[in-house]
A protein has these predicted regions:
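C-terminal catalytic histidine-bearing segment of alpha/beta-hydrolase fold enzymes
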Residues: 8-81, 281-284
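Oxyanion-hole/transition-state-stabilizing segment in secreted/luminal serine hydrolases
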Residues: 52-53, 57, 61, 137-176, ...
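Structural recognition of the beta-strand scaffold that forms the well-ordered cores
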Residues: 9, 47-51, 87-92, 96, ...
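Solvent-exposed loop/turn segments at secondary-structure junctions
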Residues: 53-58, 94-97, 132-137, 161-167, ...
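Catalytic His-Asp segment of secreted/periplasmic serine-dependent ester chemistry enzymes
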Residues: 203-285
Length: 285
């Protein structure tokens, strides 16, 4: 597809006219062609850009996430470097292991595949998962001690806590052990806290299964867990990705729920990855 055809295809989604005005620019070794469309949705102009350089092409509209935009410019100038093997570690429970979905459907696998698609063919990505259905924070701590993972990962994700809530564990256990898990996770990326992504806890109240367990109380309790994790991350400067609202659409959008009526589906995990990916691209270097 030509650059103009690609731009017009993108603009079509905004009900724009098909007569773009283009402007060619250079940014260092990059060639940037920018298209501007008028008469679009809500009478606003939108822009679409094609970036080319070092054998890599990145195209995006003006609503592109800033992290992705920055990454696009850097990766496009990175064509001569040596091949790399990026290592990803995913820590958690059933939401990380992908209960009731296929192995390639769970969010860590989808994230790995998206990263592979964004990087040069010569690069490799490997994934290790330490997670199991039913694990609470104590279980994950013990499993990490047993597994003795290496400390040279390039990216770590942490999603944990739903079973503390479901099993009725004292909240102060989560408060203590969440911080300990964060510290352990950071140690596995060479003590570089910027390489950690904490993911919020899904809300299972909005599933057929969750409707049987006082869903109003469930949601309220999970708010406490997620608020604590978010505030902890904000206080120490960690990345936190909120995906809970996606799962809160599970009753009105059944395709977000797996066949067991409880866990997220492949489709839901794809939506998780859409939010995680921009941060992952900025962190994996």
């Amino acid at each position: 597809m030509s650059a103009q055809a690609s731009a017009e295809n993108w603009a079509l989604n905004f009900n724009c006219n098909m007569t773009p005005t283009s402007q060619n620019k250079t940014w260092g070794t990059l060639a940037v062609k920018q298209y501007t469309f008028g008469s679009c949705l809500d009478n606003q102009k939108v822009r679409y850009s094609i970036v080319e350089g070092a054998g890599h092409t990145a195209d995006y509209g003006e609503n592109i996430d800033l992290y992705s935009l920055i990454w696009s410019f850097f990766i496009a100038t990175d064509g001569d470097r040596a091949a790399r093997n990026y290592k990803i570690l995913a820590l958690g429970d059933s939401y990380t292991i992908g209960e009731s979905v296929c192995d390639t459907c769970r969010f860590p696998e989808q994230l790995k595949e998206r990263l592979i698609s964004e990087y040069a063919d010569r690069d490799e990505f490997s994934l290790q998962i330490i997670a199991q259905t039913g694990w609470n924070t104590t279980d994950l701590k013990n499993a990490m001690t047993t597994a003795e993972p290496a400390n040279n990962f390039d990216l770590v994700t942490l999603l944990i806590g739903v079973n503390n809530q479901f099993q009725g564990k004292p909240f102060d256990v989560y408060e203590t052990e969440f911080g300990e898990l964060v510290d352990s996770a950071i140690s596995l990326v060479g003590d570089d806290a910027s390489k950690l992504i904490v993911v919020s806890i899904p809300d299972y109240a909005f599933t057929p299964f969750g409707q049987n367990f006082n869903p109003t109380a469930t949601s309220a309790e999970l708010v406490l867990y997620n608020d604590f994790a978010r505030e902890y991350c904000e206080a120490v400067g960690l990345s936190y990705v909120y995906i809970t609202d996606i799962t809160q659409q599970g009753l009105e959008t059944p395709s977000l729920v797996a066949s067991d009526g409880l866990h997220p589906s492949e489709f839901a995990y794809t939506k998780f990855v859409e939010r995680i990916l921009p941060l992952a691209l900025a962190k994996v270097d």
